[in-house]
């Protein structure tokens, strides 16, 4: 009825969410995690029309994206859902210790959750509730202490479904496929219109080509749809800091008639 055809692993992820009180769904971008979440939500609402569902994510941006992608408007941040970070009055302190009323809790981007926040979260789950943790274990771990998501995956006590078939990608696109190969340590990559390798003899030459390509791309696609990633932070002409400075002078050069504010190494200009 939903018009969805699930792969065998997507079906396994949905079944695990109902067979176990705690389950994990992992996969890189484009492997159908959102489709699985939509299915879990739809099935749960049909089986338990009076059940309470809560979607959570570590950040506001992730929770908004979760709400938009699933069509479920009650997504919130973990801090908000747990009542953390607000005024420490007596009533609020008492409320923080009460179990969450939700019957089904789905947390996205769980790789970003550290030990402290994970402890706060798991201590609030009521008996009988179902919890589904979703994320990409290959992303950078949380800023705070602990690689919680990876430890939960590796503990061997929680059912884990690994989604590895790429769906969210144009038929002719090579980006997601090559990302998967790189992650697996496979150096045999495929090249085409959207995945190109350009060799340079040094960082200065690379920076010059990067800036020229960037200017062409933003002229064609718009500045919000183009991004540069660098493996270097500050060392060399192709580092993030030096590329940012060079691109700023091309895209938004200094104009004496317009206001400029400099705070430390950051420069703020009109436009």
Walk through the language-model features, giving the residues of each.
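Residue-level marker of regulatory loop/turn positions in helix-turn-helix DNA-binding domains and
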Residues: 6, 99, 110, 259-260
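Conserved helicase motor core of SF1/SF2 NTP-dependent helicases
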Residues: 24, 35, 39, 43, ...
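A generic structural signal for residues embedded in beta-strands
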Residues: 269-271
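Conserved helicase motor core of P-loop NTPases
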Residues: 16, 137-266
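Conserved glycine(s) of the Walker
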Residues: 32
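N-terminal pre-P-loop "Q-motif" helix
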Residues: 4-19
């Amino acid at each position: 009825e939903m018009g969805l055809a699930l792969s065998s692993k997507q079906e396994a992820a949905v079944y695990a969410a109902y067979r176990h009180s705690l389950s994990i769904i992992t996969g890189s971008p484009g492997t159908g995690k959102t489709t699985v979440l939509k299915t879990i939500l739809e099935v749960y609402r049909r089986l338990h029309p009076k059940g309470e569902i809560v979607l959570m994510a570590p950040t506001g941006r992730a929770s908004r994206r979760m709400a938009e992608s699933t069509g479920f408007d009650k997504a919130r941040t973990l801090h908000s859902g747990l009542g953390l970070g607000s005024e420490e009055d007596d009533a609020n302190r008492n409320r923080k210790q009460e179990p969450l009323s939700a019957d089904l809790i789905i947390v996205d981007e769980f790789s970003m959750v550290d030990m402290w926040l994970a402890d706060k979260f798991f201590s609030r789950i009521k008996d009988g509730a179902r919890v589904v943790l979703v994320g990409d274990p290959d992303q950078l771990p949380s800023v705070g202490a602990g690689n919680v998501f990876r430890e939960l995956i590796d503990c061997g006590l929680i059912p884990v479904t690994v989604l590895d078939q790429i769906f969210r990608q144009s038929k002719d696109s090579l980006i997601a496929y090559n990302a998967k190969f790189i992650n697996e340590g496979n150096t045999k990559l495929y090249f085409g219109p959207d995945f190109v390798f350009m060799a340079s003899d040094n960082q200065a030459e690379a920076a010059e080509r990067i800036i020229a390509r960037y200017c062409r791309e933003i002229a064609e696609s718009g500045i919000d749809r183009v991004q540069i990633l660098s493996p270097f932070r500050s060392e060399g002409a192709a580092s993030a800091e030096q590329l940012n400075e060079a691109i700023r002078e091309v895209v938004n050069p200094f104009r004496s008639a317009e206001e400029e504010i400099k705070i430390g190494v950051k420069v703020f200009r009109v436009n």
